[in-house]
Each structure stands twice: as C-alpha cells, then as structure tokens.
Amino acid sequence: MEKNVTPMMRQYLDIKKKYKDAIIFFRVGNFYEMFFDDAIEASKLLNLTLTKRENVPMCGVPYHTSKEYIRKLILFDKKVAICEQAANSTSVGPLEREVVEVITPGVIVDEDFLNDDVNNYLVAISDYKNYYSFSYIDLSTSSLGIMFYENSFFEKLKRDLEKYSPKEIIVSENFYYEYSEKLNLNRFLINRVPAWHLDKDVAIKTIKEHFNILGLSSLGFDEEKPYYISIFLIINHIKNNLKNLLSNIDKIDINNDSLYMFLDDVTQVNLELVKNNNDFSSQYSLYSVLNDCKTAMGKRLLREFILNPILNIPEINTRLDHVEFFCKNISLTMTLREAFVNIWDVERIISRIQMKRYIKKDFLFIEKSLSVFFLVKKLFDKHNFDYWNFDKFEEDSISKVYFLINSAISSSSDELIKRGYDLKLDSLKDLKINANKYIDEYLESERLLSKINNLKIRKTNNRGLFFEVTKSNYAQVPPHFMESQTLNSSKRYKTEKLISLEANINNAEDSVVAFEQEIFDEIASNVVKHNKVLKKVAEFFAYIDLVVNFGYLAKKNEYKRPILTCSKEIFLEKSRHPVVEHYVKNTEIFTENFVKINKEKYFCLITGPNMAGKSTYLRQVALITLMAHIGSFVPASRAVIGITDKIFCRIGASDNLAKGESTFLVEMNETANILRNATEKSLIIMDEVGRGTSTNDGLAIAYSIIEYILEYIKARSLFATHFHELSAINHKAFINLSMKIEKQGNELVFLREVEEKPSLNSYGIYVARIAGLPLRVVDRANVILKSLGSRKDSSCLEFLPCISSDTCDREVLKNDTDVHVKLNEYLELKKFISNIDINNITPFQSIELLNQLVLKVISQSS
C-alpha cells in the first residue's frame, strides 16, 4: 500500500507514525481531513460521512467549524493532533505540514472545551525508587502542585484520584501493570511511559531549565529524594505535545497533608460532596446546595474548600468572621452579588494571555472585571471591611492594566485598537477608509494647477492609477507629469505623489491588519508583565465571592456560626441535613435533631426501622462537621465541633464486579481501612455493617468492630444497625439512640426524630407493605415472624421445615384476597372470625354471624 501512495499521503503516513495514539486532523486547504482508521473511528463518533479515494477511507470537517468536532472527540477521551500546512511554503512537492498541537482531555485551554466550575486536571504518578508522589496540573488556571506520599501511599492515592478526578494520567509502564487493576486506572485516559524514561538527572535538568533556576531546592525539593519525578513527567509530556503551553507555569505548590482533613475516596463518594451517586452530576450534592457563587473562580474555590477542609482553628475563624460580616451586612452582600455578575474568569484569561492564546474579548473581560475590583475597594472602605491584601504598588499596577486596556482595546465589533491610541495606525486606517476621497482631493488640486478641467484619474489592473489627458489639453500638461503611455486620443501620466498615494493605499489594508496585530501583541505583552498581581486579583475575587456566597446562604437558610474547639465533641442543637432540607423545602418541613458527643460519651448506636431517617442523620452529622471545617455557617441553631482530622463514612452496599469482589468483601475492605487509619480525633460514620453475611456472623463482626472502636480507637462514632442485640452493649462511652415511631391504629408514622433509647423493632414488614410488596408476601412474612418469635431457641435449619409443615397457618396462602386489600382490614377480619366460639352459639346466631361476615367481606372488596 505505502509503495503506491501519493506524496501527500506519504507525508500523512510519516506524521501518523509519530502520533499513533491520536486522531490526526490533517489540514488540506479549508478542511481537516482524516484517513484510514482515524477516518473510520471519527466518522462513527462524529456522525460524518465516510468516503473512499483510491481505497483509502477518509472523512473531513471544515476548518472554520472544526472546534466543535474536536470538542466532541475530547469528550470521548480521544487525543487530536492538529497538523497544519505551511502558510508560505516554497518547496517543490506537497505543502510542508507539521503537528502544531496535540489536544488531549488533560491539557485543554480553550474555554469552549472547559466547564466553568470544574478544574481540568492532568495527573502524573511516580513510584521512582519507592519515592511515591502525585502531581497535578490545570493549564487553564496555571495550577501545578505535588503531594509527597511518605506513608499510606495507597489510601492517599485513592483519595487524590477521587478528589482531583483527572481527565488524563501519566504513569510508568511498571506502575500501570502493578496498580491498574487495584486502582481501576482504565476509567481514565492513561499515558504510559517506559520505565527507563524516569531518570533522575534528566528530570532535574528539565525542571531547572523550565523554571530557570540553579537548583531544585529553590522550589522546595531535595534533589536526593526524587519525589519531583512526577513533576518532570508532566512538564515533559506537555513540551512534547504542545507549543507555548507552559509559559504560564511559574511555581509549584507543595501540598502539606497535615493541614487538611483526610477524606478517603469512599467518604467523598458516600457523602456525595461534589457529585451524586446516580448520574454523577453535581445536583443533589453538598456542592450544589452551597454553590450560589457568581463567578467561575468562586465556584472552583468552593469545590476546593469542600474537598480540602482545614484544621487550623484561627484560619477557620478568619473565614467565619468574613462570612458573619456579610451575613450581618446583607445590603452590602446583595450589592456585591449584583456586581460580581460582571466579573469574568480572570484566572483562566490571564493563563491564556500568557500562553499567547488570547483574543480581543479576553482583554475587554479583564477591563470589566477590574472595574468591579475598584468598586469592591470603595465598598469595603465604606463598610470598614478589613480584608484587603493589596499594597499601593499592586494597586497602581492594576490601574495601569485597566487604563491600558481601556485606552487601547475597542469594544466595537469592527475595530480592534481604538482610534487615538496610535497616530500611525490612525493614519493607516484613514487611508484605508478614505482612499477615494484622497484620490479625488489630489485630482482636484492638479486640475486647479493645470487648468485642465476634464483631467481624470483612472485605474487598470496592469498600470494601476494614472492621469488621463486628452489631445486638446497636451499643451497644458504640467512638467511634473511623467508620461507612461500614449493612446490614439489621449495620453496617460503618473506623478511621484500619485505613485506614492497608490502605494500607500495598496499597502494600507495589509498594513492596518499587521500593524494593529503588532500593537495588540504589544498590549498583551504589557499585560503579561503584571500577571502575578492579576492572578492575585483572581484569587481575591474567588475568595470574596465565596465568603459573600456563604454569608448570603447563612442569612437565607438560617445557618448559624459553628464554634470550633480542640476537644473531642460534637454538640448540635436543632440540626438539619443541608442537602435533604434544600431539596424538600417546598414540600415538607425537615425534622430537626440533636447530637451530643463528648470525650465521655463518644459512641452512638442508632437503631430503628428503614425509612425512619437513620442514614440521613448519620450523613447530616458528617456534613455539618465538614461545613464547619471549611468556614461555612451550618444548619443548626447551635453547633460546637471539635477539630476533626479525618471523616470516614461507610454507608450503603455495593459490589465490585470488575475486581470480583462481593458486596460483603467491599464492605469489609472499607471497614478495615477505617479501623487501620482512624484516630481519636476522627469522626466515624458506619451504616449497617455486617448485613452482607449471615445474621450470626454479621452480628459478631458488628459487635467486634464496636468493641475495637470503643477500646482502641476511641473516635467519635455513629453506628446505625438493625442488630438490636447490640443495644445491650455496656460501656461508659456508649449511647443508645433510636428514631421515634408513632403508632396510629395499624399504621406507623416515622417522626424522623432521634431519641436517647434503643429501638426494639425494625418494622421491616410494615416498610415492605408500604413499599408495595404483594399482600400475599407481606401476610406470609407476618406469619413467619410470629413463628420465629415463638421459637427463639430453635436454629434456622430446625425452623424452616416447621414453617412449611401442615401445622403452619396456611390460611394466608390459601386466601385469594385481592392484593390491594389493606393489611389492617385483613387483620380485623381475621380477629372477628377468631373470636367466634362455634361450640356456644345457636343456629340463629350462626346465621346472623354469617350475615355479618358476608357484609364485612363485601364492604372490604368494594
């Protein structure tokens, strides 16, 4: 096949060999063409018509609409290599072409491909010589950071994969083969690099060159401890695939785990912090409830806060002070929220400008945003709000950027640079716009000078502009006219000024475009000089938007300021679940509950039926604890919360078919992780541990877990269970809680209110009935339950034959009552029949009883 290909196709095949894992967008004129397997795959994903030329499958998309097709491929986790043709190629043969960019899900900077409120991370994981590290980069926001895993490598890595949800991961081949299955890495787009590629000396050289430093110590690294290999993997990957896309990265954030609350991957999922567990969108998550931010930067910071609760009480209180200020000054809060609508994504715009990916509107958006910045300063001064971390030099720098853009960039759709900014550009624009006017003015001046009234200026493609003089006026031709052509009835002349005017007019259009772009690029360069202070402005906007948002929500939702302490306590009065309350507020009133945990009484066992609110109560405590640690007010009338180093949440049942793990094995793995890693300062939330196995095994395991937590870990714990036997545990730190139930006739009302006593019944059959199980099944379950209650000492094996024997009450099974008959009506009928003493009634009484029975049956079936 390759022997008979055209020169252009040979060029394509050579390029494809270098980018085997990417779909090549091969520029041909005004189209991007795809060939061979790329064309087959792209045609299916993009719904394009697949054609053939000389047996080569091909499809294409127009250049001017290519962005939307690229975006769709990125959403399918595909890599796209953009291969452009040279603009002014002089070589013989096909036009010169080269790949100018490889767009992948992890290195997107185009705003059309990004979600405003979510960071777009590329991650690299390194295990070089057992120095484990995790590096992440979001090119769109200039964020580059690293975590050192000095211990608990596996648990922390799982946590961070969930937290950062990377679009793309770089790992060594050895790491991939060892951990791919354990970490389920194939859910991500993976870039595997050969093990020999991880070289310490090459890594040091690459990092030093990028940051223009003499040694890695200036970045916070010890060169003898090569955690920085993961940073090298990121830098090298981007340099090999993209051009000018690292110029915005000028620092590395080295994350300190000890500053933040530990939330493992299971807890992040079970608490539905930033996405729900149904469709994985943000709806019904804590983030969705707390997110009423007005800026994209504020929304992203909120996600970061939720996933990284802090442990420093003074820092938390500073945030709470700011939230309280805006909660109390609601008029200012509403003014700011209205103004924040005009703040654009400065963080991403500055990154694009640094990477030379800017367009005109980026600068106009910065100008609008900075005008809000000055307004915020005035409002803060007026209301004596003391959060202002800009000095005079920085304020002057911000003003320079604002006035530069304001004076230079035009908001008019048909103009880039404003008139008056550059005199030379203005003259070129005038010449371009008024060319005919200048020609007419010059013609009129020569008519007056020569007295030739019918003097004309004409133009041909070959000769350009010239004066035309008829025979009768030859004697009046001025001496500075230079004859260029003689015709039968006239002569054509040029002058130095006409030649110059024509040249200026011809060059004006190209000159305007080129010179305007030159000025535009110069303005961009000047703005980039202020990138550090502009990034600081972006951080300021994000934080202020977030605390204003928290203050607004506190006022709107009646949240209260939590008190953070160093004690082992959680005290909540009239607490509510923030998410459930938010989504049911239009249909019902959420039931408030108390929580009382301290160093003496720190383990709560919660019993009660399903649907009574146990799981909601558990999550409620965890979410309120987390909200307090991010600096938010909380849904409670009063909250006192001891600093919590870790939250563990083991709720729900699921299996892991990919790993061949049963529901019970998953449950035990998660429980083992909690028991290994929890400390006395942790909060443990566990729901229905032990239900994935036999009753006796489950009860024994649950009892042993509780005992271990009480005696060895001593963490604040809430443990929901259906094993009522556990309520008999006798320990000084043990508290029995249950969910209140009110019986109204044969109906149960779940009050969803916690009380300090154990529950003696799960009411499972009642729940099954209201869930819609066939009445025949429900009735049979009641019979079996009663039989079980009378045979407490019998084993299950002894009992099963018994309930299937002739002595068992088979009336329920024979009963062909319609499934819609209510259970209480059936029980009433059964009670009526059971009370008949057939040995002591007269024939007349029996007829009367039979008549009553018929009437009851008729009334119940009607």
From Swiss-Prot:
The lineage of its organism: Bacteria, Pseudomonadati, Spirochaetota, Spirochaetia, Spirochaetales. ATP binds at G608, P609, N610, M611, A612, G613, K614, S615. PROSITE patterns: DNA_MISMATCH_REPAIR_2. SUPFAM superfamilies: DNA repair protein MutS, domain I, DNA repair protein MutS, domain II, DNA repair protein MutS, domain III, P-loop containing nucleoside triphosphate hydrolases. The keyword Ribonucleoprotein does not apply. PANTHER family: DNA MISMATCH REPAIR PROTEIN MSH1, MITOCHONDRIAL, DNA MISMATCH REPAIR PROTEIN MUTS FAMILY MEMBER. This is DNA mismatch repair protein MutS. InterPro entries: DNA_mismatch_repair_MutS, DNA_mismatch_repair_MutS-lik_N, DNA_mismatch_repair_MutS/MSH, DNA_mismatch_repair_MutS_C, DNA_mismatch_repair_MutS_clamp, DNA_mismatch_repair_MutS_core, DNA_mismatch_repair_MutS_N, DNA_mismatch_repair_MutS_sf. Keywords: ATP-binding, DNA damage, DNA repair, DNA-binding, Nucleotide-binding. It comes from the Bacteria. This protein is involved in the repair of mismatches in DNA. It is possible that it carries out the mismatch recognition step. This protein has a weak ATPase activity. GO terms for molecular function: ATP binding; ATP-dependent DNA damage sensor activity; damaged DNA binding; mismatched DNA binding. Transmembrane segments: none annotated. CDD domains: ABC_MutS1. Belongs to the DNA mismatch repair MutS family. One of its GO terms (biological process) is mismatch repair.
